[in-house]
Design a protein with these regions (language model features):
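Glycine-rich, mobile lid/loop segments that gate access to catalytic sites or pores
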Residues: 163-228, 232-239, 244, 255-257
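Short, low-complexity intrinsically disordered segments enriched in A/P/G/S/L with frequent Arg
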Residues: 19, 23-24, 34-35
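Internal helix-loop-helix
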Residues: 94-192, 244
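Intrinsic-disorder-associated, low-complexity terminal segments enriched in Asp/Asn/His/Tyr and depleted
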Residues: 3, 15, 26-28
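Aromatic (phenylalanine/tyrosine) cluster motif
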Residues: 7-9, 19
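Acidic/polar, glycine-rich intrinsically disordered N-terminal extensions of enzymes
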Residues: 47-109
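Glycine-rich beta->alpha junctions and the first turn(s) of the following alpha-helix
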Residues: 289-339
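A short core secondary-structure module
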Residues: 232, 236-287
C-alpha cells in the first residue's frame, strides 16, 4: 500500500509534474460527474480537484498507524466511529465540485494558475479572506461538524510568509521548499493537517529544561540529506483523515531551544508516525445499532495524539531548522489567521 506514496515522498515535490488542465469530458468524468462537466463548460479547470469519493479512495491507499481504545485500527476509512469524521472532510471535496459553490470553495493557484480547492490557497486579498470565512461557514452549515481543514489552510499562509523572511535573513531555501510542497499538494488536491500543539509538560519551563526532552517535538539528528525528529503533537484535529502534515513550533523559542525551532512536512503515513485517537462524546453509541444519543451520525470530528518516533524529514521538506527567532513569528502569524 505504501509503495506509491513512499516513492513520491522520496522523489520530492520538485519532480512532480503538473496535472495540467484536461477537458472534463474525459472518459473518466463523462457521464459520471455531471457537476464537474458543468464547471468545465464554464471554462473552469477541474481536473486537479478530486471528488469526494476519490478522496475517500485515496485515504484507503495510506498505511496509517491508528490506535483507538487500546487497539490498532486496521481500516480507519470504514471504522464506524471514525467514518463520520472522514465524511466531514469528504464534504469539502463534494462542495468544491458543485458549481453553486465553486466561487467560495475554489480559487486560482498563485503557483500554477490552475483551479484549486480554497483550503490549499494562499490568500492574496481582502476578498480572499472574506471568501475563506464564507467557505468555512458554508462547510459548517452543510456538516454541522468540524471539517478539519482549517488548521492546514492557516498553516499554509503562515509558513508561506515566514519562510520568505527567514530566507531573506539567512539565505536558506525554505521558501522555495515550501512552494514546491504546496504545488505538490495543490496538484494532488491533498488534505493537509497542521500540527502545532506539543504536550509541553511543565509550562513554567522552556523545552530544553523539561524532565523529558521529548515533551516538545525536536530535531534529534541532522544528516546531509535531512533531519530526524522525535516528540509528539497533541489534539490533532483531522490528522487521521489527512494525506500530509505540516509541523510547526508551538511557541517562541530561545537560543537554548534551537532544536525545537523546527517546521516541516511529511506524509501522514511516514515511518515512525503513530496516532492515538481520543474519545468523542457518545462515540460508542454508534456501535449499538440505535439512533438514540448518537449525536450527528453522518458527520463529525476526530482528534489524536500523534507520536513522531524518530521520523526522517528530507531537506526539501524542511521549512525551519534552528532559526529560533522565527519560531515565535510563525506561531503569532498562524494565530492571526486561525483565531
Amino acid at each position: 500500500k505504501r509503495n506509491t506514496r513512499a516513492y513520491e515522498f522520496q522523489k520530492g515535490p520538485a519532480n512532480q509534474k503538473s496535472f495540467g488542465c484536461i477537458a472534463a469530458t474525459h472518459k473518466n468524468l463523462s457521464g459520471k460527474d455531471a457537476a464537474a462537466t458543468k464547471m468545465a463548460a464554464k471554462g473552469t479547470c477541474v481536473m486537479a480537484l478530486m471528488t469526494g469519493e476519490q478522496y475517500v479512495e485515496s485515504m484507503r491507499k495510506l498505511n496509517l498507524q491508528v490506535y483507538m481504545f487500546g487497539k490498532k485500527i486496521e481500516n480507519p476509512v470504514d471504522d464506524p466511529i471514525l467514518r463520520p469524521s472522514l465524511n466531514s472532510v469528504k464534504a469539502t471535496y463534494d462542495l468544491a465540485q458543485d458549481p453553486e459553490y465553486a466561487d467560495l470553495m475554489t480559487a486560482k493557484s498563485i503557483l500554477t494558475g490552475e483551479t484549486i480547492n480554497r483550503f490549499t490557497h494562499i490568500h492574496q486579498s481582502t476578498d480572499d479572506l472574506i471568501k475563506k470565512v464564507k467557505m468555512q461557514r458554508l462547510c459548517g452549515q452543510k456538516t454541522a461538524a468540524c471539517f478539519q481543514r482549517c488548521v492546514g489552510m492557516d498553516a499554509f499562509n503562515a509558513v508561506y510568509s515566514t519562510t520568505y523572511e527567514t530566507d531573506e535573513k539567512y539565505g536558506t531555501h525554505y521558501h522555495e521548499n515550501f512552494k514546491k510542497f504546496l504545488q505538490y499538494v495543490q496538484e494532488h488536491d491533498y488534505t493537509v493537517d497542521g500540527a502545532m500543539t506539543d504536550p509541553k509538560g511543565d509550562r513554567s519551563l522552556p523545552p530544553h529544561l523539561q524532565a523529558d526532552p521529548d515533551l516538545y517535538l525536536r530535531v534529534v539528528e541532522r544528516r546531509p540529506d535531512g533531519i530526524v525528529v522525535r516528540g509528539a503533537k497533541a489534539h490533532q484535529t483531522g490528522f487521521v483523515n489527512s494525506h500530509e502534515v505540516i509541523v510547526m513550533p508551538t511557541q517562541a523559542m530561545g537560543e537554548d531551544d534551537k532544536d525545537y525551532a523546527v517546521a516541516f512536512a511529511v506524509p501522514t503515513d511516514a515511518k515512525g508516525i503513530f496516532m492515538i485517537v481520543g474519545r468523542q462524546s457518545c462515540d460508542t453509541r454508534k456501535l449499538e445499532g440505535s439512533e438514540i444519543d448518537v449525536g450527528n451520525s453522518q458527520f463529525g470530528g476526530t482528534e489524536a495524539l500523534v507520536i513522531f518516533d524518530d521520523v526522517f524529514v528530507p531537506n526539501d521538506r524542511i521549512f525551519l531548522n534552528g532559526e529560533n527567532e522565527f519560531a515565535g513569528v510563525l506561531v503569532e502569524r498562524f494565530a492571526g489567521y486561525h483565531r
